[in-house]
Amino acid sequence: MLLTPGEEPTALPDPVVPARASSRATPKATASALRRVLRRARDGVALNIDEAAVAMTARGDDLADLCASAARVRDAGLQSAGRRGPGGGLPITYSRKVFIPVTHLCRDNCHYCTFVTVPGKLRARGAGLYLEPDEILDIARRGGELGCKEALFTLGDRPEDRWPEAREWLEARGYDSTLSYVRAMAIRVLEETGLLPHLNPGVMSWSEMARLKPVAPSMGMMLETTSRRLFETKGLAHYGSPDKDPAVRLRTLTDAGRLSIPFTTGLLVGIGETPAERADTLHAIRKSHKEFGHVQEVIVQNFRAKEHTAMAAVPDAGIEDYLATVAVARLVLGPGMRIQAPPNLVSRDECRALIAAGVDDWGGVSPLTPDHVNPERPWPALDELAAVTAESGYELVQRLTAQPKYVQAGAAWIDPRVSGHVRALADPVTGLARDVNPVGLPWQEPDDVGSSGRVDLNAAIDTQGRNSETCSDIDSAFGDWESIRAHVHELAAQGARAPERLDSDVLAALRSAERDPAGCTDSEYLSLATADGPALEAVAALADSLRRDTVGDDVTFVVNRNINFTNICYTGCRFCAFAQRKGDADAYSLSTEEVADRAWEAHVAGATEVCMQGGIDPELPVTGYADLVRAVKARVPSMHVHAFSPMEIANGVTKSGLSIREWLISLREAGLDTIPGTAAEILDDEVRWVLTKGKLPTSLWIEIVTTAHEVGLRSSSTMMYGHVDNPRHWVGHLNVLRDIQDRTGGFTEFVPLPFVHQSSPLYLAGAARPGPTHRDNRAVHALARIMLHGRISQIQTSWVKLGVQRTQVMLNGGANDLGGTLMEETISRMAGSEHGSAKTVAELTAIAEGIGRPARQRTTDYTPLAA
């Protein structure tokens, strides 16, 4: 067994990628099938999985034909990208690196690996369990003196989960995990040597990668194979290695894309996989990269058997098999992908053959450190590698650890905290490496965000409107729209498979809800959610009756002010028209002084609450959120600060290094009173990952909100609907909220948020509905009242999104609260809402009186106002 008794693998709670087929049959590679595939390759047609598997069987003249097609694709890609070496030739790139083996311990047991060992063997040879900081820095410094610019951090997966000695080593030095140690050492390498960390710690969760992104321009993890057969079958390469589950590795690859991390991945050739499984692996990488654009290079690595391993007797990958796989990788992944092959695992002549097969990158090559994964295979000397490359008609050109297009894209891909280190080493024109040695630079949080951009947007949005229809990079910021639309079609097909609801179903569900509103089955709730006509009237009447019994006839509201302190954001929420990139015509950031000024203005106008939310600006300093709270409390001590969505909290936690609980307590101590339960959208990841590229997963939203409640920070709860969702998702979302409320009791209200579509990128791309119908609005508000009965008493309706008349309809169908006066509102208005951004107390009172109900001002948490 890999784990010590009583231990379990570290949980990775983020969304799980559906498992692929356990194995894939290799199509019969007849001569005619191969001829057809080779013809398609010559024509530049992308090969599907079966065609790719057939192509991998090419040998002799057929292999030469295949490689020639791949080389043409590679050259066309380099030419179209304008990539040239200093001498004007097409480049083949490499990264001059040092290899830093942080630890040789691992919780896995891959049958071909000599990198990993056990604590006893390390002790026997006098080696530490981990490299000490001084050892890491010594390697980096010596590499810098030789012109190295990359520090490759390689290590085993989560050794502390298997080895108590590893956990003791970390705890003795103040680290709670290996990844925390890696992060700290990456910062020291940046500050003390200037080398750029490339982090290769294996499988990571969304949260872990978000934590590491600020300390490394790039990361990597070999996918290796999508073959479940190799993972599940005793005696095969990945059996007994929990981190080699293909679904888990695909999840890491996907989450890296969601976080916009330049990411290196690849496959191993010759570990027992079939050509069809190899082709499936390439297509899995292709699919992920197509959706997110984050795979910066794909390593095609040939298996080399090593002594003293379980696979010592397995033959090395054959060179023709290897070349065919490289060529197919180029043809499948296309002209824009960097295809990499390690030059130390082949001979000089084979290096030339790899170039002929479509390779355009040699990966990291070190003049100082060995390849600790393949220690028996020394790196070629750089002048020798340059000569081999030149013999094939190409120039050897040094790059940085992040490929040039990601370096040149800036903040969309490179975190501001390492961007200065990258700029110091990058050619500003090409994004390749400059001919300089690295020098240590401070790794620090950005300075306090000052006032910039269109700071009057809160007022001008109602008079002048937007200066631009969308953010500047709508074509690239949200991933591949074709892939997104495919996901939407899958969701629509699932909705279409829902059983037809008959009037008798709704009637039976109504009778059940009348007896026990909170005790119906999901099927009954779904019947209520899909009701229409007279049946919908009956559902709304039941909801209105429950509202009256629960909270009475008063229509409540809070006098508050929205303060959206910045709209600069790179998260990539596809539904959001508020987010802008720095420098966009409508982008802005408020200083803490301006936020405090607006809080004072709100106080003078009678407000008891400010609601502060903003975009996820990577330049917001680590103290930024607390600074905003303190500024408001210093100016208006009595003001209730309702601020920061779970996404903002996740961002703050990532920046700070604190746990969620510690960060929330620190904000509470700074003066934070409650948090908005926004950033929920739909709490179902199959919908969530269509709506957003990089927002926190459902599991983390739940953890943050639950923890907030536990430390005394109550929250609202929300659901945004009417985009790519269906009633089944509404029921599921409300069930999640019910479960949290049962455990914490921390929700103050529920707020249904109709999707405002007009300027939403998701809608403009043809992937979303034009918002909910009036039937949907009525059904959601009524369903919420019924399902949340006895748990959440306050159901709010949004006059900003619905307008006065439809707001009144919702108040007669289960809702009892109008939200707030707002004073300013830019998120819905930038999306295209036409119902204004502020209401006076008199106007909100008129909404209630228009349906014969009294209006009453409340506090944020619905306690009575002080006299």
Swiss-Prot record:
The keyword Protease does not apply. Binds 2 [4Fe-4S] clusters. The clusters are coordinated with 3 cysteines and an exchangeable S-adenosyl-L-methionine. [4Fe-4S] cluster 1 binds at residues 106, 110, 113. It catalyses: 5-amino-6-(D-ribitylamino)uracil + L-tyrosine + S-adenosyl-L-methionine = 5-amino-5-(4-hydroxybenzyl)-6-(D-ribitylimino)-5,6-dihydrouracil + 2-iminoacetate + 5'-deoxyadenosine + L-methionine + H(+); 5-amino-5-(4-hydroxybenzyl)-6-(D-ribitylimino)-5,6-dihydrouracil + S-adenosyl-L-methionine = 7,8-didemethyl-8-hydroxy-5-deazariboflavin + 5'-deoxyadenosine + L-methionine + NH4(+) + H(+). It comes from the Bacteria. Pfam families: CofH_C, Radical_SAM. Residues 93-425 are annotated as: CofG-like. Keywords: 4Fe-4S, Iron, Iron-sulfur, Lyase, Metal-binding, S-adenosyl-L-methionine, Transferase. One of its GO terms (molecular function) is 4 iron, 4 sulfur cluster binding. Residues 92-344, 555-796 form the Radical SAM core domain. Residues 532-865 are annotated as: CofH-like. Residues 1-28 are annotated as: Disordered. PROSITE patterns: RADICAL_SAM. Its cofactor is [4Fe-4S] cluster. Its EC number is 4.3.1.32, 2.5.1.147. CDD domains: Radical_SAM (cd01335). InterPro entries: Aldolase_TIM, CofG_family, CofH/MnqC-like_C, CofH_family, Elp3/MiaA/NifB-like_rSAM, F420, FO_synthase_su2, rSAM. [4Fe-4S] cluster 2 binds at residues 569, 573, 576. Pathway: Cofactor biosynthesis; coenzyme F0 biosynthesis. NCBIfam families: CofH family radical SAM protein, F420_cofG, F420_cofH, PRK06245.1, PRK07360.1, PRK09234.1. Catalyzes the radical-mediated synthesis of 7,8-didemethyl-8-hydroxy-5-deazariboflavin (FO) from 5-amino-6-(D-ribitylamino)uracil and L-tyrosine. This is FO synthase.
